[in-house]
């Protein structure tokens, strides 16, 4: 008698139970169980059709269901992060390719940054490199995308903001100079103090009463303590400058009339003046406007030059004579005082009375004379 093959209804029920338990374990995790200390992501490629091991009875134990749920959760997270990283990488590559296309169209008007060389890969190669990098190292792609914009920035002034413009050097005013007598090296964290070496000369800018002065040394403006320096005495510049100007501006007095006329540029009148008696500078001093009329010199510029030269020559001689007289007069009283001998003048100290002794001597002399006169008159 033929037996009927049993139906597979009993076999289907365990599989349905397994699917339900799998879905529940993946959606609702076992929160009561502690997490592993060092979870390791499986390097196998994720496949939803993987067979899950089961025991002999065909029903999963709670421990197996928890482990499978954790594995699925980790795999889902890896898939999501991988897809997001790929999307972000593609967006960054697209943005970079657009920027590079714009710069290539504009031309090489502005120099590119030094980080980008001329042999840099095109946008397609960069896209391929990004995708390969994503497949090899999915976790570190977020860092690469965050720093991807810094790899090649075609901006014209990428490093210009790093270059600081040099500060203009201080040129004055100064209130004195000081020489360093003790070496001083400031702390490396103190950028305002000057490094002092013995013998350095500092141009003092400010001398506050606190004791920390401001000065210029070797082109650097900074502070220093006054105890390390000696203030140099200021040079008497005022009276010296006029004498230098006078010595530079003053020419020596001309010795001949021809030399004087050469200086004022009127050599053409040399023969006229010599023929009419103006042979020396002493004669030229007496030149007046009427004399020029007699000499037939009618050019107003020439007349003015000749008259001015005569007046200056006269003033020069009179000034030198007065200076010589003043020097002689200043030397005479000194010689007089030196040549005078010192005379000792007796002074009465007041201790002795000399008037009575003098009177007694005078009376004695008078009596002697009277006696002599009487004796002469009484003689026969």
From Swiss-Prot:
Xref: InterPro entries: SAM, SAM-SH3_domain_protein, SAM/pointed_sf, SASH3_SH3, SH3-like_dom_sf, SH3_domain, SPIDER
What residues does the SAM domain cover?
252-316
Give all residue intervals belonging to the SH3 domain: 173-234
Region annotation (Disordered) ranges: 1-76, 96-168, 318-380
Q: Where is the composition biased (Polar residues)?
A: 141-150, 369-380
Which keywords does this chain's UniProt record carry?
Phosphoprotein, SH3 domain
Which PROSITE patterns does this UniProt record tie to the protein? SAM_DOMAIN (PS50105), SH3 (PS50002)
Here the segments flagged for biased composition (Acidic residues) are 318-327
Concerning CDD domains, the annotation shows: SH3_SASH3
A single GO CC term, please? cytoplasm
UniProt-listed Gene3D superfamilies: SH3 Domains (2.30.30.40), Transcription Factor, Ets-1 (1.10.150.50)
User: In which tissues does this protein get expressed?
Assistant: Preferentially expressed in lymphoid tissues. Expressed in bone marrow, thymus, spleen, lymph nodes and Peyer patches of gut. In the spleen and lymph nodes, expressed in both T- and B-cells. In the thymus, in the medulla and cortex.
Bias kind Low complexity: ranges: 22-41
Phosphothreonine: residues bearing it: 61, 103, 112, 318
GO biological-process terms attached to the record = B cell homeostasis; B cell proliferation; CD4-positive, alpha-beta T cell differentiation; homeostasis of number of cells within a tissue; positive regulation of adaptive immune response; positive regulation of B cell proliferation; positive regulation of CD4-positive, alpha-beta T cell differentiation; positive regulation of immunoglobulin production
Q: Which residues carry this modification: Phosphoserine?
A: 27, 34, 42, 97, 110, 113, 120, 320
Task of the protein: May function as a signaling adapter protein in lymphocytes.
Q: What is this protein called?
A: SAM and SH3 domain-containing protein 3
Gene that produces this protein: Sash3
């Amino acid at each position: 008698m033929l037996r009927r093959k049993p139906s597979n209804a009993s076999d289907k029920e365990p599989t349905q139970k397994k699917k339900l338990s799998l879905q529940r374990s993946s959606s609702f995790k076992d929160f009561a169980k502690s997490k592993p200390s060092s979870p390791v992501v499986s390097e196998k490629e994720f496949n939803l059709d993987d067979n899950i091991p089961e025991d002999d009875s065909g029903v999963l134990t709670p421990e197996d269901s928890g482990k499978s749920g954790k594995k699925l959760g980790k795999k889902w997270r890896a898939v999501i992060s991988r897809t997001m990283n790929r999307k972000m990488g593609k967006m960054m590559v697209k943005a970079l390719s657009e920027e590079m296309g714009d710069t290539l169209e504009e031309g090489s008007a502005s120099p590119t940054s030094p980080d980008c060389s001329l042999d840099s890969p095109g946008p397609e190669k960069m896209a391929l490199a990004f995708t390969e990098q994503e497949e090899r190292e999915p976790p570190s792609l977020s860092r690469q995308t965050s720093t991807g914009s810094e790899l090649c920035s075609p901006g014209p002034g990428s490093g210009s903001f790093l270059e600081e413009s040099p500060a203009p050097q201080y040129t004055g005013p100064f209130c004195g100079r000081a020489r360093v007598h003790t070496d001083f090296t400031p702390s490396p964290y103190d950028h305002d103090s000057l490094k002092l070496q013995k013998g350095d000369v500092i141009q003092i800018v400010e001398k506050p009463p606190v004791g920390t002065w401001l000065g210029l040394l070797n082109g650097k403006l900074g502070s220093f303590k006054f105890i390390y320096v000696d203030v140099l005495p200021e040079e008497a510049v005022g009276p010296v400058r006029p004498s230098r100007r006078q010595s530079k501006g003053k020419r020596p007095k001309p010795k001949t009339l021809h030399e004087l006329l050469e200086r004022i540029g009127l050599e053409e009148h040399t023969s006229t003046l010599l023929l009419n008696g103006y042979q020396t500078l002493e004669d030229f001093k007496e030149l007046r406007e009427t004399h020029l009329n007699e000499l037939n010199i009618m050019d107003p510029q020439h007349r003015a030059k000749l008259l001015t030269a005569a007046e200056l020559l006269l003033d020069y001689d009179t000034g030198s004579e007065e200076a010589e007289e003043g020097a002689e007069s200043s030397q005479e009283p000194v010689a007089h005082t030196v040549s005078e001998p010192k005379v000792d003048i007796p002074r009465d100290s007041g201790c002795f009375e000399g008037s009575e002794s003098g009177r007694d001597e005078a009376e004695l002399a008078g009596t002697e004379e009277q006696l002599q006169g009487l004796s002469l008159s009484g003689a026969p």
